[in-house]
Amino acid sequence: MKKYYYLIAATLMMGTMTFVSCNDDDNTPTEQTAVLDFENDKFTALIDNPQYNGPLLYQADSYQWEDNGNSNLSCSFSLNGSWGKGWFYGGIAISNYIDADETHNSFTYQLSVPKGNGSNNFAIVQAGSADNQAILKFSDSKAHVIKSMQVMNTTYALYASWGGIKQGLKDGYKFAVTVKADNGASKEIVLAENKTAIENWTNVDLSSLGAVKTLTFTFSGTDAGDYGLNTPAYVAIDNIVVVK
């Protein structure tokens, strides 16, 4: 009888221990993330028409957007500079233009991508030189980890009649955008290399950058001359995942 009693007691203790262990696992905090997908009416209202010389990117003094209360990412930039008023000086503009026509090979199609990713809106990063950069920043001034984002080459960058990626593809060719954080970390995203270019929306892991307050985009490539890159310095981005 004693043996039987001890057996029951031991079984109950093991069950209790197992229950507590499960409880500890359940209390492990789960990672919370926010996704900047540019998909509400506020972003749609910022899509310029026409794509070049439109009222939002060429006739205003500045352009800005923010995703407060969600990812808290934001971007603002001046449209005034030494070349006059317009989107010549770097920045990140909202778009929804899908255009795979290879004859649409000029800057008048600068807000287009050749294919969508299942949603309506995305953003176009443009940064023509080291002096004209595109900057993402957190509006709450706190450092956050950006886990990933999607990238895609634009219609203009791919098919441009002068300096287009498709024209340049060969052994030794390269076109890339580098994302640099305020903490000194950076990541090069290769958009085209040798005979291959990104022509589908592609997910890029940015977690190695660590916690950041700002991200700066700059472009580089092998097709360059005395005045910088010949390749149009554009890339499309979407679905930026931020750890809250």
Residue ranges and their predicted role:
Residues V151-T154:
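Short glycine-rich beta-strand segments
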Residues S141-S148, V212:
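Extended extracellular/luminal ectodomain segments enriched in beta-structured repeat modules
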Residues A160-V177:
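Short coil-to-beta strand junction motifs in C2/discoidin
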Residues A134, K147, Y173-V177:
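Short beta-strand/loop motifs in extracellular/secreted proteins, especially
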Residues Y4-Y6, G15-A45, K244:
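Bacterial Sec-dependent N-terminal signal peptides
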Residues A176-K244:
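Terminal, low-complexity interaction segments
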